[in-house]
Design a protein with these regions (language model features):
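Long, terminal "pre-/pro-" and other extracytoplasmic accessory regions
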Residues: 1-219
Length: 219
C-alpha cells in the first residue's frame, strides 16, 4: 500500500522511523533524536504508582472494564511503564504519575472508507476527550489504511513543537489505531517565554532571497 504524507500549515518534518523497543509511528525529526536518553519532564521525580492503579488508567483510556485487560510486562528505560493488552490493543502506562504513553491496535485496516478530513476530526476529538485540548495539527501521514496525525502543544498563539502527540485513525472503521504521547511526556512543562522575541520583519531579513516566506508564527 502506498504512503502519502501531507503537511498542514506548511510544517516541514520527516515521516517515519523505527524506534527500538517502541511502536513505529511517525519520526519527529530533530525532536526525537535525543528522546531515548533524556529525562521525561512530566514524570521525573513523580510518585510511582502501583500496577493496579496503572490498570485502572489503562481501562479508563480504553473505555472498558479492567477485568477485560491482561497484564503483559513492564518496560524499563527512561520512561518505565506497565504494559497491558485488551483484544488487539496494547497500552502502556508510565510507572510515575500514571500517564498513558502509547496505545497500539494491531487490527487490520482494510479498504479506506473514511475521508481524510473525517479522520482528522476523529483524531482531534479523541485527544480532547482524553484531556489534550490545546493541540495543533501539523501534518498527517497515510499508510496501510491508517491516517496518523501529528500534533504539537499550542498556548497563547505559540506552538511548542517538541510537545508532540501522534494519533492514528483506521480509515476503514474510524477507530483509533494508535496513540503516541512520548514526545509530549518527555518535553511538556510550563514555560515562561522571554519578552525578547525576534520581530517578524527582522526574522524575514534572515531568510535567503531564494526562499519565499509563506507564513510567520511563534514557535
Amino acid at each position: 500500500t502506498g504512503e502519502k504524507t501531507e503537511y498542514l500549515a506548511g510544517d516541514m518534518e520527516d515521516a517515519q522511523q523505527s524506534l527500538s523497543d517502541y511502536p513505529t509511528l511517525i519520526y519527529d525529526g530533530p525532536f526525537s533524536d535525543h528522546i531515548m536518553s533524556a529525562q521525561p519532564k512530566m514524570t521525573s521525580g513523580a510518585k510511582e504508582i502501583s500496577k493496579e492503579n496503572a490498570l485502572d488508567a489503562a481501562a479508563a483510556f480504553l473505555g472498558c472494564d479492567k477485568k477485560e485487560i491482561s497484564f503483559l510486562s513492564e518496560e524499563s528505560g527512561n520512561v518505565p511503564a506497565y504494559c497491558f493488552s485488551h483484544n488487539n490493543k496494547t497500552v502502556a502506562v508510565t510507572k510515575n504519575s500514571g500517564y498513558v504513553i502509547y496505545m497500539l491496535d494491531s487490527s487490520f485496516a482494510g479498504e479506506a472508507k473514511l475521508k481524510t478530513a473525517d479522520a482528522l476530526k476523529k483524531a482531534s476529538e479523541f485527544l480532547s476527550s482524553h484531556g489534550y485540548a490545546d493541540m495543533k495539527e501539523s501534518y498527517y501521514s497515510t499508510s496501510d489504511g491508517v491516517c496518523t496525525v501529528n500534533y504539537a502543544y499550542k498556548k497563547d498563539g505559540v506552538i511548542y513543537y517538541p510537545d508532540l502527540i501522534k494519533v492514528g485513525v483506521n480509515l476503514e472503521t474510524g477507530d483509533i489505531a494508535s496513540f503516541d504521547a512520548k514526545g509530549y511526556i518527555m518535553n511538556h512543562t510550563e514555560r515562561n517565554l522571554s519578552s525578547d522575541i525576534l520581530p517578524q520583519a527582522e526574522a524575514q531579513k534572515s531568510v535567503s532571497g531564494l526562499l519565499t516566506v509563506l507564513e510567520l508564527r511563534s514557535v
